[in-house]
Amino acid sequence: MYGRGPMWDNRIRNGIPTPPVTGTSSLQYFLDRLAAGVSLPVEGHVLLVHECALKADGVRAARAALKEPYLAICPLSNLFIHNTLPSIPLMRESGIPICVGTDSLSSNDELNMVAELRAVQEAYDVPLGELLGWACLNGARFLGKEDILGTLEPGKKPGIVHIKNLADGKLTEASESVLL
């Protein structure tokens, strides 16, 4: 965020273009760039991914600039790259819908949604039902597919996954998913 450190030095040494150093968060940089190109607030769903540096002012700025923001977290990638998770309590308090993903194998050892959810549950006291809503319904809503995906209801055709090896409603190291 400040234009220093080994990654920055490596980019300079190798002639790789460097992003502008603004001293602001990536979210604020994105919102500032967005405001320079379009009228705010932006209509439609906008997915804000990772947001490990999210603070209350970022939530306020996102709500002001975006009519329908969504947050996407990839917990194991966040831990792999930043050795931290985003502020899940702040995200929950914000009222902005949270989605969960796996990111990619370039920043993760496996693509395993149960492991992603378990990483959140190990760090924060988030009920399993809420986590499943982030993983299923919120993703379907973001994609505009909640009429056919995201929940088990008449007329919908979601994939069905059974999560085995729970302990008192919590995910465990032994928890795994089985596609039904």
Feature names for model-found ranges:
Residues V178-L180:
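Short peripheral tails and domain-boundary helices/loops at the edges of structured domains
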Residues A167-A174:
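Short, Lys/Arg- and Gly-enriched loop/turn segments at beta-strand edges
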Residues L76-I81, L131:
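A generic structural motif
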Residues M1, N165-A167:
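Short beta->alpha transition motifs characteristic of CBS
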Residues M1-Y70, H82-I98, D147:
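Histidine/acidic residue-rich metal-binding segments in metalloenzymes
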Residues E51-L54, L76-N78, D103-L105:
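Active-site beta-loop-alpha junctions enriched in small/polar residues
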Residues L40, T84-N165:
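His/Asp/Glu-enriched, well-ordered alpha-helical/loop segment
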Residues L71-P75, C99-T102:
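Short beta-strands and strand-loop turn motifs
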